[in-house]
């Protein structure tokens, strides 16, 4: 879709890049310094069995991410990275797959997509035009051969199948791939003008480029009826880790699709991401749930989204307590925070339980509708 040559990536398709590995180690080092400062980890901590869990999806990029992060977090402990199943295949515990489906449910999902995202989907023309200009689309072989001649606003199709991730065809899917590649190129290429194939873009324009891939991810995974379905295993896993007796630290390494569906299922309110060109799921982002005990013995939980800023990623900045990643406090709809921005532990557990049980409600409601239709 472009006559230009892309940046020479340091890794294979869908694998963790060398820059990504460096940044994960830097992020792990930041968490080590923070945990030591808070008194949770001693210096050169060697955890006892069960105190720390590093668990990754079985894809190359998630295993590698966890390995690099663990090297920064516990550099002398030789902590194992846990993964299950065949290497470079999705583990069902991390796969955002549809596990319940009926015609009535699928129709309701598509109606909900239109209700929540329809206006934004219909307003993508400016973003598409910007991307086409950056990549010199009309000079590409795809355009000249007639393979792809336009970026349409009305050709999106999403299909669902039990045991599989949602699948999209149409312009948004193709434009998402270009948007994703441009943003990765922006992080990897030191010269921002080269990253935009000779164009000079403002930060706002980079955000508009990213909006295409971000909207794709939201449409696929951040729809309430979808999120409680595809995030069901991850919600159970996180809920278990948060209440695990004797556990000091858990690192669960999945994907941006997991972040989108988990936060939607937990009824997270909209948030703004400073210091990045991404809008909802920043590259390398981490949902961080920290459990605290106050002087009165009450347990409290903070919920944050933590990520390296765009400049930190581009500069491979060393992260520590003075030069730290961006921390965005998240708000769970309907739950009360105290003066320190913390939730009651039992309220957070209840929100997880509600999100987990929502799956059963969906199955019950739409299976019943299907039976009524059959009758």
Q: Which sequence ranges carry the predicted segments?
A:
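Signature for phosphate-centric chemistry
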Residues: 1-53, 57-250, 254-375
